Regions:
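Conserved, mostly hydrophobic/aromatic
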Residues: 11, 38, 117, 150
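Hydrophobic faces of well-ordered beta-strands that scaffold small-molecule active sites
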Residues: 8-10, 46-48, 104-106, 124-126, ...
Length: 180
């Protein structure tokens, strides 16, 4: 067995939006604080999530969470609270992350995000919620970047189909599973 160091990915997600409110700073500055902390503890990669609420959920999808803790009544409204970054913001975060000596990635949840992230990410991360979205997997795989897939919320048959799909397109590396 090879003795290799684990590759640690810090899930930034969209968590920094709440930090920005608490500290009364911009979300971009809060995201950079998260990157700073990840670099301080020796993390290998900072990972974000890229989406627009309009592309991932219906405006009428009801909340599935405890409304006493989060009063937002629709999934769309909640996702919209956390989809403020654009391509320029992600480019700035990418450059900042690389300057700190870490890799940068962001899980895209739509085609537009996958496309603009192509020149930034060191690899793509596909969410387990997208493992049955074969056209999207083909789109990402065809970009030729390494691909990490999350399998936590997927059936084994979905994982198998996603892997077989990636094998049919030009990808350079596939890693699974990811552990959240």
């Amino acid at each position: 067995m090879r003795n290799t160091k684990p590759y640690v990915i810090a899930e930034m997600g969209v968590n920094f939006y709440d930090t920005a409110k608490v500290l009364n700073i911009t979300p971009l500055d809060a995201a950079k604080l998260y990157i700073d902390k990840a670099a301080e503890v020796g993390v290998d990669c900072a990972k974000f999530q890229s989406y627009k609420a309009d592309t991932i959920v219906s405006k009428n999808s009801p909340a599935y969470w405890d409304l006493k803790k989060e009063p937002t009544k629709t999934q769309h409204a909640l996702f919209q609270k956390h989809d403020r970054f654009n391509e320029s913001d992600y480019r700035e975060l990418c450059e900042y992350t690389h300057a700190k000596g870490m890799d940068f990635t962001s899980t895209p949840f739509d085609y537009a995000s996958a496309d603009y992230l192509e020149k930034m990410v060191d690899f793509y991360k596909i969410s387990s919620s997208d493992l049955s979205n074969i056209p999207f997997i083909q789109h990402i795989g065809a970009k030729g970047k390494p691909v990490y897939i999350s399998v936590g919320a997927a059936y084994l048959s979905e994982v198998d189909e996603a892997v077989r799909t990636l094998k049919t397109v030009s990808y350079t590396h596939l890693t699974l599973p990811t552990i959240a």
